């Protein structure tokens, strides 16, 4: 793929390692490449889960490459399919992504992690959105996704002052799923990925579709919406072979064999 991205396939799990010394910062070229990777992951029927991490133990990603910015790359440059870092604007990805945050996740690096479905982080990780101190705003999802997780006062402090949040605080606020040691990070992310593989792929796709389309609706309206037949995956999963296989495997005391149909 490129010198900046290392891809490893472990069965149905794709591991993506961002490797751009010194801080795994992302320029437009790298963002384009990441977008291609995530779109290929989306469209590959053999892949079920992706894990994104950074090389080394200090930086997950420092976000936008300020060296590229100093050389003329604009904040509103074309960062390719999927938006900045290839994931922040893919809104039809019905497979789970795990961010294995191995260190600092700043600016667009934090926004990349927020675009994932799960965040597992090392105990030395920290998170920040310092864009206001650089004369820009975290418009690749930070100022949009973070308010859905945190109270307004905490969001304001993070986006307006650039305050850093450590791993344990992020866990308390529900930003991350797990905090583990650096040595355990990838094994823990892989364990979570395998748990996701053990769930039915159509059910996962339907869940993501429902979350995505009903998150701003009142509950009563959401019920009507998901039962209206307009969704792609939800009606399919109800009449799928997997919906038969799950209860059958349970009754026969064996692991289900999912077909994704």
UniProtKB/Swiss-Prot annotation:
Recorded GO MF terms: hydro-lyase activity; L-carnitine CoA-transferase activity
Signal sequence region: none
UniProt entry tagged with the keyword Lyase: yes
Reported function: Catalyzes the reversible dehydration of L-carnitinyl-CoA to crotonobetainyl-CoA.
Family assignment from sequence similarity: Belongs to the enoyl-CoA hydratase/isomerase family.
SUPFAM superfamilies, sorted: ClpP/crotonase
Superkingdom, taxonomy of origin: Bacteria
Metabolic or biological pathway, per its Swiss-Prot or TrEMBL entry: Amine and polyamine metabolism; carnitine metabolism
Protein known as: Carnitinyl-CoA dehydratase
Assigned keywords, A-Z: Lyase
Biological source species: Escherichia coli O157:H7
GO BP terms in the entry: carnitine metabolic process; fatty acid beta-oxidation
PANTHER family: ENOYL-COA HYDRATASE, MITOCHONDRIAL, ENOYL-COA HYDRATASE-RELATED
EC nos: 4.2.1.149
Active-site annotation: 111, 131
NCBIfam families referenced in this protein's UniProt entry, alphabetically: PRK03580.1
Family annotation (HAMAP family): CaiD (MF_01051)
Catalytic activity, as annotated: (R)-carnitinyl-CoA = crotonobetainyl-CoA + H2O
Taxonomic lineage from the root: Bacteria, Pseudomonadati, Pseudomonadota, Gammaproteobacteria, Enterobacterales
């Amino acid at each position: 793929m490129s010198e900046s991205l290392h891809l490893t396939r472990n069965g149905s799990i794709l591991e993506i390692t961002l490797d751009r010394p010194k801080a795994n910062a992302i320029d437009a070229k790298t963002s384009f490449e990441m977008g291609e990777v995530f779109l290929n992951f989306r469209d590959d029927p053999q892949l079920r889960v992706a894990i994104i991490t950074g090389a080394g133990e200090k930086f997950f990603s420092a976000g936008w490459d300020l060296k590229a910015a100093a050389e003329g790359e604009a904040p509103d440059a074309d960062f390719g399919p999927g938006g900045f870092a290839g994931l922040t604007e893919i809104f039809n990805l019905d497979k789970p992504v795990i961010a294995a945050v191995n260190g600092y996740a700043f600016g667009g690096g934090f926004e990349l992690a927020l675009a994932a479905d799960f965040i597992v982080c090392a105990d030395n990780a920290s998170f920040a959105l310092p864009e206001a101190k650089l004369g820009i705003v975290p418009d690749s999802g930070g100022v949009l996704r973070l308010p859905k997780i945190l109270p307004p006062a905490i969001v304001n402090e993070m986006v307006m002052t650039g305050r850093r949040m450590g791993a344990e605080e992020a866990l308390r606020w529900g930003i991350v799923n797990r905090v583990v040691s650096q040595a355990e990070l990838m094994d823990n992310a892989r364990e979570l990925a395998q748990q996701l593989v053990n769930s039915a792929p159509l059910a996962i796709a339907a869940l993501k579709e429902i979350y995505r389309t009903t998150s701003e609706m009142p509950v009563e309206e959401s019920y009507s919406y998901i039962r209206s037949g307009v969704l792609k995956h939800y009606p399919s999963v109800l009449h799928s072979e997997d919906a038969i296989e799950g209860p059958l495997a349970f009754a026969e005391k064996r692991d289900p064999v999912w077909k994704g149909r």
